[in-house]
């Protein structure tokens, strides 16, 4: 058990609410998409209620990886008793959440979360989602603080016209493919295509 719904924060700020004047109740009827980081130290979690979604990052307790070594016991002794102890330890592990802390990342209204992806070093979290116009979009966050990285996808690619899809990524950069939404007028063919996004520089360049 990584985390239970009871361990999810009860309320949080929307990142689009720049003044942070008020919190909103966190949607937590059920779990949505989740994603484990490449190092195994973080897991991104979605909880949802109808058309609302909440993203958080749980930090994994590394010591659980040593369960096998810690349950082998000393040499000799009663093998049945040792086996019973190992079973008990395993049951305790599975019953208890192994997340050491949970940080809120963001809340979304009128969207469907499609995918959560950590970069290789787990420094950043990429969130792919469908907005209220059924257009695929994305946001990028610092996975330790939960802060939104201000990469201006919306001014470059209109939210109601252009899909943004993750293709691949390296350490602190990734490639996206921009396509037009079907049955939409006034599409600029110069905008569609592949781009490189540099997270540190917060730049988007066509390739």
Each language-model region and where it sits:
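Acidic, small-residue rich beta-repeat scaffolds with periodic aromatic anchors
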Residues: 1-7, 159-207
């Amino acid at each position: 058990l990584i985390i239970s719904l009871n361990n999810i924060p009860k309320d949080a700020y929307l990142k689009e609410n720049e003044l942070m004047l008020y919190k909103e109740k966190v949607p937590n009827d059920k779990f949505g998409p989740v994603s484990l980081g490449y190092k195994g130290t973080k897991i991104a979690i979605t909880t949802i209620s109808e058309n609302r979604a909440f993203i958080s990052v749980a930090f994994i307790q590394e010591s659980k990886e040593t369960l096998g070594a810690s349950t082998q016991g000393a040499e000799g002794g009663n093998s049945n008793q040792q086996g019973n102890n190992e079973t008990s330890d395993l049951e305790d592990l599975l019953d208890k959440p192994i997340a050491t802390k949970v940080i809120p990342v963001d809340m979304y209204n009128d969207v469907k979360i499609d995918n959560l992806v950590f970069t290789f070093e787990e420094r950043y979290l990429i969130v792919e989602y469908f907005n209220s116009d059924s257009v695929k979009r994305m946001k990028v966050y610092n996975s330790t603080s939960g802060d939104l990285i201000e990469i201006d996808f919306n001014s470059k690619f209109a939210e109601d016209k252009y899909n943004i899809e993750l293709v691949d990524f390296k350490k602190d950069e990734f490639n996206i493919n921009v396509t037009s939404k079907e049955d939409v007028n006034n599409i600029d063919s110069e905008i569609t295509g592949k781009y490189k996004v540099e997270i540190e520089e917060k730049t988007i360049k066509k390739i």
